Each structure stands twice: as C-alpha cells, then as structure tokens.
C-alpha cells in the first residue's frame, strides 16, 4: 500500500497557514487516492532524543567500524526508530512555517537527529548516496512577510533560508522529486487571506496527481 508521511511543522493548531494548506492538500489527496495510507507526524508531540554524548560516540564508532557499547547501541536504536517512518513512506508532505528566516527548531532537531550515515544516507569515500531515493515530497512553505514580492524589504534571495535548506536536505537524502508551494503575507490581513486561497487552490491541484 502506498503511504504518505505528513510532517506537521507548526505548533499553532488554530490558525496556521501551513496546516490549513496541508489539510486542503490531504483532503484532495484522500479523495483522489482512497486506497492510500496517510500517517501524520506532529513534531511538537514527538519525543526527539537529544543527540548527546552517547549518540555522538555511536556515530563515530560506526564511522570507524568499532563495536558499539550498550549505551551507544541504545542511543543509535532510538535514532533508527525515529527515521523508520521516512523509510516506510513512499511520499512526504511537509508543512514548514518560516521561523527567523529558516525552519522551526523542532524540525531542525528531527532532521539533525536522523540525518546519519547508514540511516538516511551512505558514504563510500567517493561520494554520498541518499537512502530515500525513489520517493517524492511536497513542501508547504508559510511566511508572514512577502519574500517573493517585488520591492520586498526581506527579499528571498537574501532572507529565505527555509526553502533552500529543505530542498537541499531532501535531495541529499535521495528525494529528487520535490514540489514546493509557498503561502506568504500571512500577517497582512486581506492580502494574506488572498494568498492562502491561492496556495490552497495550488495545493489541491498538485494533490490530485501527487
């Protein structure tokens, strides 16, 4: 069965633009693909382990080919369990609000924890290979200001560390088919409402054939 993993990146459950657009995407996707499974991963209700001394020691033991100690093995098992839903899914939907020109720290924590050699990528001395190859992703990017608007005082070329980071990371772990939908000006009343409506329509269109 085809499985979609929805990673919800906003803690604002009542008025989140990224969640609203993601929900529209998922509603349309369910209608178009009633036999597919959708799994939700709310990072704000997810126990993400600290990448602490034991985890770091396990990482370097693995890189050097040394056997793991019991504490290192336990730490590494938690990392592998956290990454398991990404291996089990065929498609990904990310809802990503922009925080301080980048992504929420909880999402960065998750990515930092699971982006490990032999977990999400391999390295043979000649180069890297992502272990999520063949999968596809749609990413909803929500922003309070108009980064793409002409004359913006936060132009995307200088201030957008959100979309480039997500796309670089996804491709690094093997996901080459990446679609982005941007909803901006969420702090601007009527203008923000118009942009939400446009993003929702775009999400529904993409979801039908995703």
UniProtKB/Swiss-Prot annotation:
Annotated FMN binding lies at 10, 16-18
Cofactor: binding details: Binds 1 FMN per subunit.
Residues in the signal sequence? none
The protein's matches in Gene3D superfamilies, at most eight in alphabetical order, are given as: 3.40.50.360
Keyword Oxidoreductase recorded? yes
- Give the protein's biological function: Quinone reductase that provides resistance to thiol-specific stress caused by electrophilic quinones. Also exhibits azoreductase activity. Catalyzes the reductive cleavage of the azo bond in aromatic azo compounds to the corresponding amines.
HAMAP family recorded: Azoreductase_type1
What binding partners and quaternary form does the record give? Homodimer.
Q: What is this protein called?
A: FMN-dependent NADH:quinone oxidoreductase 9
Q: Which organism is it from?
A: Burkholderia lata (strain ATCC 17760 / DSM 23089 / LMG 22485 / NCIMB 9086 / R18194 / 383)
Recite the lineage of the species: Bacteria, Pseudomonadati, Pseudomonadota, Betaproteobacteria, Burkholderiales
């Amino acid at each position: 069965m085809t499985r979609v993993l929805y990673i919800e990146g906003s803690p604002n459950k009542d008025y989140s633009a990224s969640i609203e657009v993601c929900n529209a995407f998922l509603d349309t996707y369910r209608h178009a693909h009633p036999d597919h499974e959708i799994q939700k991963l709310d990072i704000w209700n997810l126990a993400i382990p600290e990448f602490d001394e034991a985890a770091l020691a396990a990482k370097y033991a693995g890189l050097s080919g040394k056997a793991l100690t019991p504490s290192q093995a336990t730490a590494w098992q938690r990392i592998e369990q956290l990454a398991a839903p990404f291996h089990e899914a065929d498609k990904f939907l990310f809802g990503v609000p922009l925080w301080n020109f980048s992504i929420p720290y909880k999402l960065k924590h998750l990515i930092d924890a699971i982006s490990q050699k032999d977990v999400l990528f391999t390295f043979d001395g000649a180069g890297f290979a992502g272990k999520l190859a063949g999968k596809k992703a749609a990413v909803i990017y929500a922003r309070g200001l108009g980064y793409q608007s002409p004359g913006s005082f936060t132009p995307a070329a200088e201030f957008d560390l959100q979309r480039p980071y997500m796309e670089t990371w996804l491709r690094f772990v093997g996901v080459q088919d990446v679609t982005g939908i941007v909803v901006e000006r969420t702090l601007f009343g009527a203008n923000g409402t118009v942009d939400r409506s446009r993003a929702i329509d775009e999400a529904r269109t993409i979801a039908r054939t995703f």
